[in-house]
Amino acid sequence: PTHEEQEYNFMVGNGINKLFERALPEGEKTEENVLRVRKEFIPYYDVHNADDSRPYPGISELLSYLQSEGIQLAVASNKYQAATEKLIAYYFPEIRFTAVFGQREGVNVKPDPAVVFDILKLADVEKEDVLYVGDSGVDMQTAANANVTACGITWGFRPRTELEKFNPAYIVDSAKEIEKLVSSTC
């Protein structure tokens, strides 16, 4: 079925299987249909995932700044692993990420904290040294589940009100605010 464009913002964020389940018509939300749609979607998305996407304003500069300050960077996404790696390599080739993790076989999707724990282990850092930045309630819940500091961003897919429900330590309106926040706490 077709959906209003703004509805898609609330379908994404929990992995592609959940996206397909939410998008399918009532009565057709079966695992079989989800897997059928997934099988058709992945080859297309593998080729076209960067067609209409762009980094948000200021993100490339923010990542470069953080890297220059010696801060370890990581990605924890609910996109499937291959798509996550491809998008990050395409948009941020100059950034050295400690980890780039998407949805992986045998690892629960966010808000399960497993992906954060995997990153902590790879980075060899303590929870109290982490700032988990995200644009959705799923991200804020992931940070809470991992017991790391959460920073919600208001320019993503979800409204500020969704972020506020999770009481993150910070909510920011621009990438520059993250830079100031990190500068003041380092």
Where do the language-model regions lie?
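Structured helix-beta-strand junction loops
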Residues: 14, 69-70, 103, 166
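Asp-based, Mg2+/Mn2+-dependent phosphohydrolase catalytic module
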Residues: 6, 81, 85-186
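N-terminal helical cap/lid subdomain that shapes the substrate entry/recognition surface
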Residues: 1-61, 65-69, 82
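Conserved phosphate-coupling serine/threonine residues in phosphotransfer and NTP-handling enzymes
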Residues: 77-79
